């Protein structure tokens, strides 16, 4: 068996490193194993490990580990989930897996835990939601992937949007008029998640046809022409993205098909046919016309003869099942997009004033998804449904007026029906079951009180904690009118701006109607890290969140805690540092009842690094430096200035720092991409404030007082913080307790930690057993492990030492030294089959049987 090949095979497994080391050690000693047997053993080990993985709070015998709020490792999307990005001036949907894999292949990655993280040195942007409930293009800081062997959850909303993610992927919800993250596993039917209804765009004005066809063409840049190499007519290469071009593509999406040599469009409306003829004439192309009876209805075909145009249009799909929106369209000129949507609706759309609906159908889901995104360019929201054979896009009547103003129809019959629908709408009827704004708190009620607005009207919205956008807009309008009459300056009121922000938001808070578990058949799952609020948008328009990186003292984030057998092993091994060090910090009387004071202490304790205070840290290729963009709000929140940050950087690194507003440029002597990338992790970890080793602090109210929970431990430094109750504050790091509080405190900590661990698994063990273990571990004045390097290795009996671990080694060493085992203990006597030296086993008296028998005879 090739040891190097075996090591590589084991290193590629998705299991802990300690398990990999143990597996390699044991397999390398077995010389008679075939490759097939080795593979079988490896599969068994991996399967056993996966079965041992448990959900939070789930206990499996004594082996139960609680993994709560694991940041950045399990919060991911599957390969095929598309997200919307902007690269240069082009907006496009891309599979997240394809994007991340390409970036890692191109720029490499850093292994952080189980994740492969690639910090992007180039500018790619994601559509992101901010606290102002507006969407903006924000830079993607890094791409992330990691292996996943569990289930995925698929979420469907009332408007027909869908997203698939890992259960621990982070979404955002609206709570008390703020945007906050929440794990997917915590979402439930009835919750509302944001779906984009407006997309800001760059507006690409023109494209080169040569960028979208194969290499079998000749480009004449002087005359702006492109033509096939062998025969065929030329067309303009650089073509303006105007309304007419957009309309032609829209009609093609609805009614067109292509062959290798021509484009065919079928329709009977003379207005549409004239537009097609005009477009062909504009390009100088020949066309033919044919009456067509396809078995369903009479039609009329126009065939435009151009292999160049035909190949270009294949970017939009070639059949009804494969039609789609080409990538360049999403960032195209608004007039071009307007023309495309009108052309498509003229062909396939319909409107019914009586049913108050505008709709379009297609055999292609990808096309319907693309049209929905394009409608968002005009602030028009749509609903997706599916019939037995087709995908349907519905524009609610609330957006009919907007559709009439921005898009409209060219076909007279459809145009007049749309006008009839718009004129029939009643502005007073504002109920909308989809566009509801959740979790408004008491802001509307408080605002109404300021102008004596009838409380009974507003109280029901506070009770239900949701209100339709149009309804809220109507009430705000009336409150504004009352404020003018009563001389109240509502512009100075916080509640007014909170509600105004909700009304003018760029998202619909879409209700979840279905959540289901599905299998994951891919090796990796993926994520991206985005500047600001860390949100990005999927191709279905769902805004999602990548991590819980920001401060959450209200219990949004949680702490990792090792429980069960792994924790028991840590205790008896007397580990210098637990795998998940935590502290429970109690506060003094004047602090424990005041949340604000508790949060101040939390901020004083929590370690603040440059990575957590910066909007982004990236390589600036133009200046050959590391660019650090600081967040003024975060700096102010933690009581820091830019000068404080600069001073901290200079203490750790020898770099030249240029300052441009809130952006720092860190320059090294010999810059290169490799050298700059190597320094980024060090820069991210520069300590600015707080106690080293304490990564996060949570504030929770328990038993009538506020208690701090930390991820990380530093007992000595925490005791120095004013306001901390040192008589009750504890850590799960037993060695730290010994160093700070002494051996007696460490003994008590061992007992308490073991008892708590066992109780959490529902196991009852007499405390005297735990006390005995603690006494043995601390008897010599320092905490010693139960193992060959501690208590067990110090046993006087050779056989007792050999029975614990490394049998051959102990017996060989004892024989070499000539050790004698007096068989005084329990273990060694059991091994050799002798009575235990205990109780009657201690008696060494002998009896003279003959004497006893003779004595009895005399009597």
Swiss-Prot record:
Keywords: Autocatalytic cleavage, Cytoplasm, DNA-binding, DNA-directed RNA polymerase, Endonuclease, Hydrolase, Intron homing, Nuclease, Nucleotidyltransferase, Protein splicing, Transcription, Transferase. It comes from the Archaea. It catalyses: RNA(n) + a ribonucleoside 5'-triphosphate = RNA(n+1) + diphosphate. This protein undergoes a protein self splicing that involves a post-translational excision of the intervening region (intein) followed by peptide ligation. GO terms for cellular component: cytoplasm; DNA-directed RNA polymerase complex. PROSITE patterns: INTEIN_C_TER, INTEIN_ENDONUCLEASE, INTEIN_N_TER. Its main location: cytoplasm. One of its GO terms (molecular function) is DNA binding. It is found in: Cytoplasm. Pfam families: Intein_splicing, LAGLIDADG_3, RNA_pol_Rpb1_5. The keyword S-adenosyl-L-methionine does not apply. GO terms for biological process: DNA-templated transcription; intein-mediated protein splicing; intron homing. CDD domains: Hint, RNAP_A. Its EC number is 2.7.7.6. DNA-dependent RNA polymerase (RNAP) catalyzes the transcription of DNA into RNA using the four ribonucleoside triphosphates as substrates. Forms part of the jaw domain. Belongs to the RNA polymerase beta' chain family. Part of the RNA polymerase complex. This is DNA-directed RNA polymerase subunit Rpo1C. It comes from Methanocaldococcus jannaschii (strain ATCC 43067 / DSM 2661 / JAL-1 / JCM 10045 / NBRC 100440).
């Amino acid at each position: 068996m090739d040891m190097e090949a075996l090591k590589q095979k084991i290193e590629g497994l998705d299991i802990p490193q300690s398990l990999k080391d143990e597996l390699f050690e044991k397999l390398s000693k077995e010389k008679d194993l075939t490759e097939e047997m080795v593979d079988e053993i490896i599969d068994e080990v991996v399967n056993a490990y996966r079965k041992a993985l448990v959900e939070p709070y789930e206990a499996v015998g004594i082996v139960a580990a609680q993994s709560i709020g694991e940041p950045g490792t399990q919060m991911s999307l599957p390969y095929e989930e598309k997200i919307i990005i902007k690269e240069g001036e082009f907006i496009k949907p891309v599979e997240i897996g394809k994007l991340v894999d390409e970036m890692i292949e191109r720029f490499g990655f850093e292994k952080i835990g189980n994740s492969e993280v690639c910090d992007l040195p180039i500018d790619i942007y994601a559509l992101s939601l901010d606290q102002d409930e507006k969407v903006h293009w924000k830079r993607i800081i890094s791409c992330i992937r990691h292996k996943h062997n569990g289930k995925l959850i698929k979420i469907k909303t009332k408007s027909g949007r869908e997203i698939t993610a890992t259960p621990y992927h982070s979404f955002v919800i609206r709570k008390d008029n703020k945007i906050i993250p929440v794990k997917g596993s915590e979402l439930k039917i009835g919750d509302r998640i944001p779906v984009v209804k407006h997309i800001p765009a760059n507006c690409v004005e023109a494209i080169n046809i040569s960028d979208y066809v194969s290499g079998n063409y000749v480009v004449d840049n002087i005359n702006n022409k492109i033509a096939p190499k062998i025969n065929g007519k030329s067309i303009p290469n650089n073509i303006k993205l105007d309304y007419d071009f957009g309309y032609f593509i829209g009609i093609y999406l609805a009614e067109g098909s292509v062959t290798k040599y021509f484009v065919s469009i079928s329709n009977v409306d003379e207005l549409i046919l004239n537009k097609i003829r005009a477009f062909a004439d504009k390009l100088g192309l020949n066309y033919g016309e044919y009456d067509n009876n396809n078995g369903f209805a009479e039609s009329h075909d126009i065939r435009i003869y151009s292999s160049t145009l035909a190949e270009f249009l294949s970017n939009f799909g070639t059949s009804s099942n494969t039609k789609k929106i080409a990538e360049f369209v999403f960032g195209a000129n608004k007039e071009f997009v307007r023309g495309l949507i009108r052309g498509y609706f003229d062909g396939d759309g319909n409107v019914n004033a009586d049913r108050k609906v505008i709709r379009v159908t297609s055999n292609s889901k990808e096309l319907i998804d693309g049209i929905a995104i394009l409608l968002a360019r005009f602030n028009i929201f749509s609903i997706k449904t599916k019939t037995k054979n087709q995908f349907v896009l519905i524009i609610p009547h609330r957006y009919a007026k907007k559709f009439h103003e921005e898009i409209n129809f060219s076909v007279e019959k459809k145009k007049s029906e749309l006008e009839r629908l718009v004129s029939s709408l009643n502005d007073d009827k504002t109920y909308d079951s989809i566009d509801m704004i959740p979790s408004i708190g008491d802001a509307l009620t408080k605002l109404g009180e300021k102008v004596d607005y009838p409380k009974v009207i507003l109280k029901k919205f506070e009770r239900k904690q949701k209100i339709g956008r149009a309804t809220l807009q109507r009430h705000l309008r009336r409150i504004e009118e009352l404020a003018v009459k009563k001389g109240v300056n509502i512009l100075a009121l916080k509640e007014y701006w909170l509600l105004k922000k909700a009304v003018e938001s760029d998202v619909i808070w879409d209700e979840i109607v279905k959540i289901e578990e599905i299998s994951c058949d891919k090796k990796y799952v993926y994520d991206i890290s985005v500047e600001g609020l860390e949100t990005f948008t999927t191709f279905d328009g769902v805004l999602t969140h990548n991590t819980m990186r920001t401060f959450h003292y209200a219990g949004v984030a949680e702490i990792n805690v090792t429980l069960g057998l792994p924790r028991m092993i840590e205790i008896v091994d007397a580990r210098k540092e637990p795998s998940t060090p935590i502290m429970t910090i109690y506060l003094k009387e004047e602090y424990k009842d005041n949340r604000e004071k508790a949060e101040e202490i939390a901020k004083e304790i929590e370690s603040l690094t440059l990575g957590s205070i910066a909007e982004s840290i990236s390589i600036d290729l133009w200046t050959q430096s590391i660019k650090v963009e600081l967040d003024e709000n975060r700096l102010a929140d933690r009581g820091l200035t830019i000068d404080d940050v600069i001073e901290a950087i200079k203490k750790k690194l020898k770099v030249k720092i240029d300052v441009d507003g809130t952006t720092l440029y860190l320059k090294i002597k010999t810059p290169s991409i490799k050298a700059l990338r190597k320094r980024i992790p060090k820069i991210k970890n520069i300590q600015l404030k707080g106690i080293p080793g304490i990564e996060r602090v949570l504030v929770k109210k328990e038993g009538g007082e506020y208690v701090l929970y930390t991820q990380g431990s530093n007992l000595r430094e925490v005791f120095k913080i004013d306001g901390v109750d040192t008589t009750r504050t504890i850590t799960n790091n037993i060695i730290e307790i010994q160093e700070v509080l002494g051996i007696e405190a460490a003994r008590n900590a061992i007992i308490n930690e073991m008892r708590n661990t066992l109780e959490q698994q529902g196991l009852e063990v007499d405390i005297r057993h735990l006390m005995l273990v603690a006494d043995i571990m601390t008897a010599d004045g320092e905490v010693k492990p139960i193992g060959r390097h501690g208590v067990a290795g110090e046993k006087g009996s050779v056989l007792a030492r050999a029975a614990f671990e490394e049998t051959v080694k102990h017996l060989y060493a004892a024989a070499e030294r000539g050790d004698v085992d007096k068989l005084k203990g329990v273990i060694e006597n059991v091994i050799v089959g002798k009575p235990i030296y205990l109780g009657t086993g201690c008696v060494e008296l002998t009896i003279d049987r003959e004497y006893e028998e003779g004595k009895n005879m005399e009597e």
